[in-house]
């Protein structure tokens, strides 16, 4: 079974590009990362930074998660991210997405040993 840390990497890490390469980026990425397998995932964020930099956030600013848990951490620096949001015309299995580029602080939930990101909570 896929570990929570591996799932985070599959769903949220794209270190190979510095930003969304094209308007089709989200459609391709959401499909290739299996985020549209049994439904269209409405919103998903990809982080364009080295994995080590994202893992390091787990030792940065401790903040409360949206669900009230206390194991969330906010990055000290801004990171290059792409938000993929489902379009109005999107209908499973033909999921369609719009990409929004941003440089924001990310907030991730961390757990385990080693202490690594397992959930993308927000960007601010």
Curated annotation (Swiss-Prot):
Active site feature: 12, 119
Family annotation (PROSITE patterns): RNASE_PANCREATIC (PS00127)
Tissue: Pancreas.
Disulfide partners: 26-84, 40-95, 58-110, 65-72
Alphabetically ordered keywords of this record: Disulfide bond, Endonuclease, Hydrolase, Lyase, Nuclease, Secreted
Residues engaged in binding substrate: 7, 10, 41-45, 66, 85
Cross-referenced CDD domains: RNase_A_canonical
EC number: 4.6.1.18
Top class in the EC scheme: lyase
Top-rank lineage group of the source organism: Eukaryota
Main location, first listed in the record: secreted
Catalysed conversion reaction: an [RNA] containing cytidine + H2O = an [RNA]-3'-cytidine-3'-phosphate + a 5'-hydroxy-ribonucleotide-3'-[RNA]; an [RNA] containing uridine + H2O = an [RNA]-3'-uridine-3'-phosphate + a 5'-hydroxy-ribonucleotide-3'-[RNA]
Gene Ontology cellular component list: extracellular region
Gene3D superfamilies noted in UniProt: Ribonuclease A-like domain
Gene Ontology annotations of biological process type: defense response to Gram-positive bacterium
Compartment(s): Secreted
UniProt xrefs under Pfam families: RnaseA (PF00074)
GO molecular function, one term: ribonuclease A activity
UniProt cross-references to InterPro entries, sorted A to Z: RNaseA, RNaseA-like_dom_sf, RNaseA_AS, RNaseA_domain
Biased composition (Basic and acidic residues): 1-13
Complexes and interactors: Monomer. Interacts with and forms tight 1:1 complexes with RNH1. Dimerization of two such complexes may occur. Interaction with RNH1 inhibits this protein.
Family in the record: Belongs to the pancreatic ribonuclease family.
Main function: Endonuclease that catalyzes the cleavage of RNA on the 3' side of pyrimidine nucleotides. Acts on single-stranded and double-stranded RNA.
Protein name listed in UniProt: Ribonuclease pancreatic
Source species: Connochaetes taurinus (Blue wildebeest)
Gene: RNASE1
